[in-house]
């Protein structure tokens, strides 16, 4: 009988960040820095760079998972991806491209 399970996870966080103050400034006075930090809880937030698409970030997270677990990539049958994109048309899940 085949067993199913999660043996590890990986993460990728973009190198570029925006601060709560920068977010407040972009609202042109609608939100103060204090409101962004205290009410929304955002002190700094990662922001994807030019090369940080959903699939690219997913692949980097997958490489991190492989490094953390020592699993041979050829032994993986399925990849679950929780990356998110918004478009006005149907999209294929990034997990298919990452695998």
Regions found by a protein language model. Name each.
Residues 1-80:
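Conserved "HGTGT" condensation-loop signature of ketosynthase/thiolase-family condensing enzymes
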Residues 23, 80-99:
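Active-site-proximal gating segment of KS-fold condensing enzymes and close homologs
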